Amino acid sequence: MKRLIMTLLLAACMTAAGAKDKVGATIGCDFVGQYIWRGQKLGNVSLQPTLGIDYKGISLSSWGSVGFDSDDAKELDFTLAYELKGFNVGLTDYWFSEGNYFNYKAHQTTHVWEANVGYDFGFLSVQWFTNFAGNDGLNRSGKRAYSSYFEIVAPFRLAKLDWTATFGAVPYATTSYDANGFCVTNISLRATKDFIIKQKWHLPVFAGLTGNPRAEKLYIIFGTSFSI
């Protein structure tokens, strides 16, 4: 799996000649009423900063989540990704604060390494994610599950708002998603309104609903984003 992902990344980099040749950077932060990820609640009110750079379709970004509740786990993720004409592939290192950051020992680390591949058709995007190393969940045999998740997202515009409809599911058993087999874990609808301040500052505000049929949960989400 590792060799396949690295081969895809190297091949993608070699075909990037026609992409933008300027280095870009992103700094931003989301403020969310509760931290919902792939249909699972991972925290309450949280700040979620991000920092990234990109060059010729290749990007390296960091993302974190810090909850206001002392019981919420702190999270720090790094993602290396490549995108070309709708196709995208990436590697993400997830880390949660229950363990030491520089502990990479097998069966001890709290890092999770995930690979993803997807395609954006414009009117619809599809993504597949698979854990390939680290603190992965277990299958029904008690072995590494290579926990996976796939997602379909459809953006549209209605009533002067930008909407996204999301369908996400887990294809097979894993304790990471509390799944005994194929199950739907994420059905979401979200609307975003971009407020423009003094004709140059943007303040997107979003709200929506996320349902997790597997867990029989329904969440309301609300937040805002800041970026420069």
What are these regions (language model features)?
Residues 23, 43-47, 72-76, 109-113, ...:
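Residues that define the transmembrane beta-barrel architecture of outer-membrane proteins
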Residues 154, 189, 195, 216-228:
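Outer-membrane beta-barrel "beta-signal"
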Residues 20-54:
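Outer-membrane beta-barrel initiation region
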Residues 162-197:
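Outer membrane beta-barrel transmembrane domains
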Residues 106-174:
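Detector for outer-membrane/organellar transmembrane beta-barrel domains
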Residues 1-24:
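Cleavable N-terminal export/targeting peptides
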Residues 27-35, 57-68, 89-101, 124-136, ...:
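Transmembrane beta-strand segments that form the barrel wall of outer-membrane beta-barrel proteins
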Residues 19-24, 86, 154-164, 192-205, ...:
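Short loop/turn motifs that connect adjacent beta-strands in outer-membrane beta-barrel proteins
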